[in-house]
Each structure stands twice: as C-alpha cells, then as structure tokens.
Amino acid sequence: MGFVKVVKNKQYFKRYQVRFRRRREGKTDYYARKRLIFQDKNKYNTPKYRLIVRLSNRDITCQIAYARIEGDRIVCAAYSHELPRYGVKVGLTNYAAAYCTGLLVARRILQKLRLDTLYTGCTDVTGEEYLVEPVDDGPGAFRCYLDVGLARTTTGARIFGAMKGAVDGGLNIPHSVKRFPGYSAENKSFNAEVHRAHIFGQHVADYMRTLEEEDEDAYKRQFSKYIALGIKADDIETIYKNAHAGIRKDPAFHKKPEKKVTKKRFNLAKLTLEARKAKIAKHKADFLAKIQADVEA
C-alpha cells in the first residue's frame, strides 16, 4: 500500500480521540503498565503486586502497590531518606543506598503480613543470585514484579540494586543476573564479587582513595559531607553492614516527632467588653484629671 496522506478535515477531528492524560504528559508507559497490572483470569480478586522503584536527585523511593479501577493502592513504602536512622547519613542515592532501601521495604511488608519470621531472605550478602524458596507447611512467599517506570534498564542501574535488596529481604521477584553490576555481555558471565562490592559501597570507597591521591582539592569538594562526618574509605563497608543488621532488627516506620511551634502574634489581641469599658473609663479619668489640673493652674 502506498503512502496515504492524512486529511485533517471535519470528519478527522470529529473522530479524534486524545491519548490518556499521563501518556500526554509523558509519565506512564501504558504498554508496560497493561502487562504489569493484568492478573491471570483464574485468580479471582487476587491483586497483582508491583515493586515500584523511582529515583530522584536526592531520594530513592520503593513502594509495593496493586492496581484498582479508582487508582493504585500503596501497601507499603520505604525511602532512602529513612536510612540515617540506620547509620547511613551520606550517599543516599548510590547503589548501596538503593540496596538498603529495597531491603527495608521487603522487611517492612513481610513484618506487616507477619511473614518476617518464615522468610528471612539472604542474611549472608555475597552478591550471587538468590531466589526465595517457599516453605512446605505454610503460606507462600510474597510475589511481586519490578516496575521501573520510564527509567533505562541498563546493566548496573540502581533500580536493580533496589530489586536485589528486596529479593535478599525475602520477596519473590522474577529476575536474572544479566542487569547486575559484574555481568559481562561479551563473556556471558557474572562476577558476584563485583556485585558485592557495589552493595557495600566499595566502588565509592575506591573512588575516594583514587581522588585523594590524585587531587586533594577535588576530594575535599566531592566528599565534603563524608569528611565533615569523619567517614573514610575504610569505614564504608562497616557502615552498610551495620545498616543491613539494623534494618532486619527494626524495619518498622517511625513517625517524626511533631515540632512544637511557639506562635508569635504580630497584631493586638481583641479586647473583651470589660477590658474596653475599663480602657474608656481610664481615658475619661485621665482627661478629667488633666482639665482639673489646668483649671487649678
């Protein structure tokens, strides 16, 4: 069939249908979303859960959600800005922080469903592939699917660090090692040691050492927050190990204490009736006293 020019006449505009709003805004890939939210037809009223991972300049968000007609419902959420409670005070958007955030959301949802004692996940972090095995006499493992949104799924991306943390935390997420750091597309091989180094922030530590040797001014500028907190390259692995242990010990969400703000009043308070009468009486008395003083003078 040859080229057919689209004639934008009255009939064209009369039948024209606009795309979904979030497609017009460039926020949702509906081709992927359709395949992520549609449940098998032989599973009645069973939600299809998604592990939603989103990255921003200052934060990493991990949510477990399922779709309904009126909109998605968030079951559980974890954020990398919660990590300072576990000792990770800097580098809240790197691969190691993404792993910690994924681990946190996994332990939190399992604690909420009372499955945290049955499915402890992978406690010895080696960077190798780990798949959750369901227990024989008990509920199955919590299954969800990774939702990356519009992000690029390149090898070594932080999104897969969050997924690895969730898998090691005890969630059943279908995946392979092809997108983890340490996988070589040329050799079709996976080096778990490289992946483990990223999980414990050793790629950051190596860069700290290199930069400190080559350019001290650049080191002080790049790692100023690390220097202010007294964190050195050799301390990073210990920090993340302690964070993993702390997350497993207490993954529950803690609300921030409410700030008690002292209200400042910049306008005069409204007087009561008695106060107004007393004020007028005082003015009258002062005025009469002044007149009396003038007469006597």
Swiss-Prot record:
Example of a GO MF term: structural constituent of ribosome
Pfam families the record matches: Ribosomal_L18_c, Ribosomal_L5e
Subcellular location per the Swiss-Prot or TrEMBL entry: Cytoplasm; Nucleus
A cellular-component GO term for this protein: nucleus
Biological process per Gene Ontology, one example term: translation
Predominant location: cytoplasm
Domain of life according to the entry: Eukaryota
InterPro entries reported in the protein's UniProt record: Rbsml_uL18_euk (IPR005485), Ribosomal_uL18_C_euk (IPR025607)
Keywords, comma-separated and alphabetical: Cytoplasm, Nucleus, Ribonucleoprotein, Ribosomal protein, RNA-binding, rRNA-binding
HAMAP family: Ribosomal_uL18_A
Physiological role: Component of the ribosome, a large ribonucleoprotein complex responsible for the synthesis of proteins in the cell. The small ribosomal subunit (SSU) binds messenger RNAs (mRNAs) and translates the encoded message by selecting cognate aminoacyl-transfer RNA (tRNA) molecules. The large subunit (LSU) contains the ribosomal catalytic site termed the peptidyl transferase center (PTC), which catalyzes the formation of peptide bonds, thereby polymerizing the amino acids delivered by tRNAs into a polypeptide chain.
Self-association state and partner proteins as the record states: Component of the large ribosomal subunit (LSU).
The family this protein is said to belong to: Belongs to the universal ribosomal protein uL18 family.
Protein name as it appears in the record: Large ribosomal subunit protein uL18
